[in-house]
From Swiss-Prot:
Protein name per Swiss-Prot or TrEMBL: Zinc finger CCCH domain-containing protein 30
Swiss-Prot/TrEMBL keywords: ANK repeat, DNA-binding, Metal-binding, Phosphoprotein, Repeat, Zinc, Zinc-finger
ANK repeats by residue range: 90-120, 125-157
Provenance organism: Arabidopsis thaliana
Keyword Ubl conjugation among UniProt keywords: no
A Pfam family per the record: Ank_2
Length: 716
């Protein structure tokens, strides 16, 4: 134990060392000789401080009985400086020394037998006994503090550095429980540590870095120390730095910065470009190290649920976590932003409020997810439904590749995760029907009588939609892969440089062009050694009409195919799968097709509409059945004989000689027929074509159809 006394034995020698005599009492004894002068001093106060440090109760009692006033005296004590590891000489009382080393018995003796001042401050640091007990690091410091508090110690007294006893607590590293108990005992207002500003002093190497001032001192001052001597602050005092008014900062409550789009996708997401110090709370952009930083919900797929690991301090997954990090990511998430009403209503004074202030500002909630973002699965089903309905007016991608959100982030996989919320809902009353024109096997007999007379209007609307959608589809086919067989053909047609809008129109309305394209397409398939399933090219049968009724107009079917220019290996393999599924129905479809073709021929003998013309379907449908509105599906024996002769495919060419005898062309009619077949647009623009011209065009289409049927039968 290191100690020192406040009164030292001083020996004055004039020339040489002489023997020194010590007296038993405390008086100064001077022996004077003619040649020598000796001064001897002795002090027992140093022994009292040492006795107090060693918890020697009997020695302290004897010293107090000998001189009761020595209890309140202060003497030099060599020990560790408070708040550091440096050893210095400073003035201490016996009670301070006993409190520093945890001498419980000596403290009880001093406070019980004498009138010692437990709140006395001395030394250069103006410390008290309670400061010494808190900073001494004794194992039994809790009992010492309780004794001093019971004796009347004031825990609000400040030392020379403006610190209370609770601000200078030092305990061994393994005694964290003692530290917490001391914090509870020495709290200024009796509350817990988490509810007040509390500093814990750590050991520092020198005095220059030790001063630490309380942030809430009685004098209202505050201090700071060096990084080595700065204490650990359990709760920081709220303090906002004042910045000069910056007119260049945008107003986050007005203009574009207050819109839902900016708040959800850009607020505290985009980095700030200002290189000078400014108020981050007034800036809508993110800064390095800012706690309000958000991940872009269009690039990082996370929910609005708070991350439990992030609440504890850090999330090991970082930006790849599927949960929200922080309040801003949670409440500014598109699934939760402004889905609830603010309790303050229109009187809300928050700079950035996460809630809606009026019912009109509420964002819609989706029943499938309970949030403001549609379900990813429901959107996938919606996209699949659109791909199955090529004629749907909404048959576009769920989120256009040209949208600002898709172009801004440069990531295609985020388009399905964050679709636009204004996509209309899809209602499919006939969802049990297969809408693909190559697979449906609907018959005209299945159509009710009251709907049969409306088929012409449906087909006219279908053809008009088909032409208009073909013009607008070329822009999106580049970025959207074909989803089915019909998309494959339409993609090839829209990407072909040799077809313009007029060519697409002629492909829709010209039977001659369709026949030529179909023949060329069959030749390419033969080169790939594959077989194409029978494609219905019957322009007069009700089957071509009921497709337009149930599948809707919009995309070009394989009957309207333009010339493909890309390699057909991948496409033919896909078509071969369709062929396997249709081979079982091939014979039945051919017979039904031939039957309807024969019925159409007999019908044209009496009334001569143009076969397959979209503009004259009213005439065709009105003359199909009897006058009472009921369709007449009967046929004569003569027609059956002609059917047998025309259905024989033993020869190289079909027997169509009886058709040649029905019509004799005049030179004028031949010219009109050539003009009609050369341009599909010319036929479309004639609301009431001349009857002979219509008849020739229909016969030509029927002949081409029969040739195609024969080619298909030969391949089978």
């Amino acid at each position: 134990m290191c100690c020192g006394s406040d009164r030292l034995n001083q020996i004055v020698s004039s020339r040489s060392s002489l023997p020194i005599s010590f007296e038993e009492d405390n008086n100064l004894v001077t022996n004077t000789d003619m040649n020598h002068l000796t001064v001897e001093t002795e002090d027992t106060f140093a022994s009292l401080l040492e006795l107090a440090a060693n918890n020697d109760v009997e020695g302290v009692r004897l010293s107090i009985e000998r001189d009761p006033s020595c209890v309140d005296e202060a003497g030099l004590w060599y020990g560790r400086q408070k708040g550091s590891k440096a050893m210095v000489n400073d003035y201490r009382t016996p009670l301070m020394v006993a409190a520093t080393y945890g001498s419980i018995d000596v403290i009880k003796l001093i406070v019980s037998l004498t009138d010692a001042d437990v709140n006395r401050a001395c030394g250069n640091d103006q410390t008290t006994a309670l400061h010494c007990a808190a900073s001494g690091g004794a194992v039994n410091a809790i009992q010492v503090v309780k004794l001093l508090l019971a004796a009347g110690a004031d825990l609000n007294l400040l030392d020379a550095e403006g610190q209370r006893a609770g601000d200078v607590i030092v305990v061994p590293p393994k005694l964290e429980g003692v530290k917490l108990m001391l914090q509870e005992l020495l709290s200024a207002d009796g509350s817990s540590t988490a509810e007040r500003n509390l500093r814990v002093v750590t050991n520092v190497p020198n005095r220059s870095s030790s001063p630490c001032h309380s942030p809430t001192g009685e004098n209202g001052g505050s201090g700071s120390g060096s990084p080595l001597g700065s204490p650990f602050k359990l709760k920081s005092t709220e303090f906002k730095k004042e910045y000069p008014v910056d007119p260049s900062l945008p107003d986050i409550k007005n203009s574009i910065y207050a819109t839902d789009e900016f708040r959800m996708y850009s607020f505290k997401v985009r980095p700030c470009s200002r290189a000078y110090s400014h108020d981050w709370t007034e800036c809508p952009f993110v800064h390095p190290g800012e706690n309000a930083r958000r991940r872009d919900p269009r690039k990082f797929h996370y929910s609005c649920v708070p991350c439990p690991d992030f609440r504890k301090g850090a999330c090991r997954r970082g930006d790849m976590c599927e949960y929200a990090h922080g309040v801003f990511e949670c409440w500014l998430h598109p699934a939760q932003y402004r889905t609830r009403l603010c309790k303050d209503g229109t009187g809300c004074a928050r700079r950035v409020c996460f809630f809606a202030h009026t019912p009109e500002e509420l964002r819609p909630l989706y029943a499938s997810t309970g949030s403001a973002v549609p379900s990813p699965r429901s959107n996938a089903d919606y996209a699949a439904a659109l791909s199955l309905l090529p004629g749907s007016p909404s048959g576009v991608s769920v989120m256009s590749p040209l949208s600002p959100s898709a172009a801004g982030n440069g990531m295609s996989h985020s388009n399905m995760a964050w679709p636009q919320p204004n996509v209309p809902a899809l209602h499919l009353p006939g969802s049990n029907l297969q809408s693909s024109r190559l697979r449906s096997s609907l018959n005209a007999r299945d159509i009710p009588t009251d709907e049969f007379n409306m088929l012409a209007d449906y087909e006219q609307q279908q053809l008009l939609n088909e032409y208009s959608n073909a013009l607008s589809r070329s822009g999106r086919m580049k970025s959207m892969p074909p989803s089915n067989l019909e998309d494959l053909f339409s993609a090839e047609g829209s990407s072909s440089p040799r077809f313009t809008d007029s060519a697409l129109a002629s492909a829709v309305f010209s039977p001659t062009h369709k026949s030529a394209v179909f023949n060329q397409f069959q030749q390419q398939q033969q080169q790939q050694q594959s077989m194409l399933s029978p494609i219905n090219t019957s322009f007069s049968s009700p089957k071509s009409v009921d497709h337009s009724l149930f599948s809707g107009g919009g995309r070009m079917s394989p009957r309207n195919v333009v010339e493909p220019i890309s390699p057909m290996s991948a496409r033919v393999s896909m078509l071969a799968q369709c062929v396997k599924q249709q081979q079982q129905q091939q014979q039945q479809q051919q017979q039904q097709h031939q039957f309807r073709s024969l019925s159409s021929r007999e019908l044209r003998t009496n009334s001569s509409p143009i076969v397959g013309s979209p503009v004259n379907n009213n005439t065709w449908s009105s003359k199909w059945g009897s006058s009472n509105g009921q369709p007449d599906w009967g046929m004569s024996s003569e027609a059956l004989g002609k059917l047998r002769s025309s259905s024989s495919f033993d020869g190289d060419e079909p027997d169509v000689s009886w058709v040649q005898s029905l019509v004799k062309e005049t030179p004028a009619e031949a010219k009109e027929k050539a003009a009609t077949s050369s341009s599909g647009e010319h036929v479309m623009k004639q609301p009431n074509p001349v009857e002979p011209v219509m008849d020739h065009a229909g016969l030509e289409a029927w002949i081409e159809q029969m040739q195609l049927d024969q080619l298909v039968a030969q391949q089978n």
